[in-house]
Amino acid sequence: MKMNKHYNELKASYLFVDIAHKVAAYQEAHPEKEIIRLGIGDVTQPLAKCVVKAMHDAADEMGTKEGFHGYGPEQGYPFLKQAIQGYYAGRGTKLDEDEIFISDGAKSDLANLLGLFDVDNTVLVPDPVYPTYVDDNVTDGRKIIYSRTGQENGFLGMPDESVKADIIYICSPNNPTGAAYTRAQLKAWVDYARKNDAIILYDAAYECFISDGELARSIFEIEGARECAIEICSFSKIAGFTGTRCGYTVVPKELELSLIHIS
């Protein structure tokens, strides 16, 4: 039996675990200090009462002969998919119900989606960014190219025509910098992806924090994005229940046709 050799290429520890240890050590040494936590994107308030009630109602329903229904639909309950449809429609973006896939969270989807793509693909990852993007691809053995960002470009990397990537990660607003792309900037990425037959994995976990009308809250607000992008979303941030585990991914029908063409 052979083990996956690429696991040896992972860093010895996870970034957020390191941060937690450093914070704990500092707090022990300085108990009088109030710490503003800028590590993992956790929440600081309890679950909203409406969320707790919905969980209670669902559990109570499953405890009755009439309400018990075992495994749910493999792609998510229609009532939730329809609610997500309405959420997008309220911002002017139309989705079909069968383009929405409910899951146990964005982090799982970000990893599981890679099963669709060959390990020979080259991955473009902004730096700094959510470390899971890198770890998921390191363990698969894909080549990773970093798009360096800094104050000089507002921590927003832009396409480089000299670089050929097959899978492009975009997180907007970005974790950890908070930088968010304008529609014009996202259009440049969409154009690059279509030109290079690339796929954009668009992490929209923090879209609910956008209030500036010049900034897109969904990649699908951009013309042509439905042909080259997958959008991953998390209820941990919009509904404030980190650890409860629920999210969804949007895969437009136009992308399905594009993937058939590429393959």
Protein language model regions, located:
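N-terminal small-domain helix-loop-helix segment of the aminotransferase-like
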Residues: K2-D104, N112
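Helix C-cap/helix->beta junction micro-motif
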Residues: H30, D140, K195-N196
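Conserved core of the PLP fold type I
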Residues: E66-D191, E207-I222, R226, I230
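Residue-level marker for buried hydrophobic side chains located in beta-strands
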Residues: S172, I200-L201
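Walker B catalytic acidic pair
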Residues: A204
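Conserved core segment of the aminotransferase class I/II
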Residues: I222-S263
